[in-house]
Amino acid sequence: MDNITTERFNGVNLSWLDKGQGKAVVFVPGSNGDYRAWLQQIDEFSKHFRAISVSRRFQFPGKYQNGGSSTVDENVDDIKQLVDHLQLDKFSLVGHSFGGYVALAFAEKYPHLIDKLILEEPTVFPFLMTKAFNPLKLIPLLFKDFAAATSFMRTGIRGIKPTRKHLSNNKIEKAKLSFANGIIGHPVTLDELNPVMLQGLDDNIKTFAAESKTAFAYPLTIESMRKMKVKTLLLESDKSPNWFAYICKNLARTLPDAKLVSIEAPTHWLHLDSPVEFNRVVMNFISEA
């Protein structure tokens, strides 16, 4: 078994798996994930790179503290303290979902540290709306892209809102199921889920209360993204709810040096569903001059 390191940064415990040698590649999980979400990447990438998989604040083996905060800002600061501790000079950064939003914000704040940026369906909410839990804020998106707006509303109605409600009532199994239904985009059973995803839900679902509360609060603007010079790879699934593709396509148009690749995958978790293709595409991108 690989050894996991845990240290305290920014007032919280962070854990990570560090394997391999060479150019560093740091993997940041999304909501309800942790370092284990990337094990199929770590095993392959560590043959060619120094692969580092991070558990963000409160993620397994950590535990959520009631009332704990997990903003984009805080997660960016956590990762900065971690990479300073690891003495990483320049590295590639891979982020999934909310972890992709964190990775983008990190690259915008510390571009000199980033060699390549890989964003797997990042939840960059400024492209959708600027304030959470207010349907009126979706009206501009309805006129821009009706399919993206309605799919995001379905995710909110089926996933985000009931998950938060179930967590507040300590109905953990219902919270896990509503989260999966909302993000996958159609009704599922927990038994149908990828075992790694289910493991992440089992151990991390309580962290969603903090992350969903502040996910819209980070001041990442279109103007600031247009100034980013980091080479960026955007990855989208061909089966995810439409709003993920909407964000990816808008990022591809906004970031000065970005390319978008679609991977056949049944859910938002491309790196779990299609690991061979995911690994091939990402490693090729990192290896490019």
Feature roles, as predicted:
Residues 190-250:
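Conserved serine/cysteine hydrolase catalytic core
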Residues 56-58, 122, 265:
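Active-site loop/turn elements of alpha/beta-hydrolase fold enzymes
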Residues 89-134:
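Conserved hydrolase catalytic core segment
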Residues 257-289:
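Catalytic active-site module of serine/aspartate enzymes centered on a nucleophile-bearing elbow/loop
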Residues 154-158, 164-207:
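Conserved alpha/beta-hydrolase catalytic His-Asp/Glu region
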Residues 115-163:
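Flexible "cap/lid" loop of the alpha/beta hydrolase fold
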Residues 8-68, 82:
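Conserved HGGG/HGGXW glycine-rich cap/lid loop of the alpha/beta-hydrolase fold
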Residues 43, 52-98, 109, 130, ...:
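Active-site loop/oxyanion-hole signature of alpha/beta-hydrolase fold enzymes
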